[in-house]
């Protein structure tokens, strides 16, 4: 493995500036779910120029693509994302909330880094395949719409991963370690009520209020929260409350629900009950209701064999060396965070490493930027979040790591994270992830026994818990509304 590590390290460092430029360019063009046309084409064209065969519009998603190099088996996928979040515009390298354009998008989850690291890993693996004449195929999967869109779930449904043997990915974080916990499955759907408009004072008896129906539905689901499993969550947002005039009986209103639980069977059960509440609200108000199923994703299925292999690579490369300017800026960011922010970050670190993880987290209460890799341990913990990587993980073995791109304590989906996502701190963490994924991919090419063990572990679970795509066939990906 030492020879592999040296080769991968040299290959990625040789193109360091190119990769940081690409990450920054995607940061400069923040696009939300299923509208990442610039970012997708930027990566696809660069991979095409590097000698990959690129297939666009995969899974009937215009900004999803596959870039492939090599021949035959095994086929190893590197999963890249590039979507941003609405309303998180923020100047880079600024330790106070200062938007570039108020109300516009921003990379609040570091997906400019996520996609570029997978891109860099794919290039490095291609160089290794060319250098050593090794058989096998490396693929970069351009996956849009992770943030609230479940792009990979749609792609799984359309069969684009059917011939893949294993997949690797990562996520930017404040620490280095393994993403080794289960996640929450979810369903997102909206209910649109239609009533009859009327003068709210002169003839309210002639109106039928869609807004009343939404209010009754949210009241009903709030009571439902008392009668669902403890780890389930039901969130909602009223996306249309009708016209802005209060003296009109509202003829239209809409509410969006996001339902989460550790298992999809529980999510589906709660979803069915929420749908009944919507029907009841329509009945009580003499309105009509229409449900629009938006998206869903399954829980994440860890693969311990593949995680161990990836952890070995991550541990070899280790955390980046930080200079005084980076540490000073990270301290400025930390000064804007609450003690609860820092504690939540430490809790996330602890959750990945068992008892050793708890000790590790306590030792790093005052750490500014991660300076060692967190311990790894197989765990039954469930992360209170969702990812469409989950659906890929039920089709084939998947492993993913975290890499330090932000000051310890930085919460996801915040201006602080956007600000750090275009700095040398983020770049160093991104390249660590790229090296880790590339070295693990090469290891899978060389060690057929390792790959077979990963697949056997996966099959042991899926033989008794077969995968069913949670998104109905008639549902198509939709941009953020």
Name each region found by the language model:
Residues 26, 67, 78, 111, ...:
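Divalent metal-coordination and catalytic microenvironments
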Residues 2-107, 112, 116-137:
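Acidic/His- and Gly-rich active-site-bordering loop/insert found
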Residues 63-64, 85-87, 94-106, 112-113, ...:
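Histidine/acidic-residue-rich, glycine-tolerant segments that coordinate divalent metal ions
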Residues 215-481:
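Metal-dependent amide/peptide-bond hydrolase catalytic core
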Residues 77-79, 88, 194, 401-404:
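Non-cysteine beta-strand/loop elements that form the S-adenosyl-L-methionine
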Residues 4, 15-22, 35, 39-46, ...:
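General structural feature for long, well-ordered alpha-helical segments within catalytic domains
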Residues 2-3, 21-25, 97-104, 193-201, ...:
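A short small-residue
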Residues 31-32, 141-145, 294-299:
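Conserved short loop/turn motifs at secondary-structure junctions
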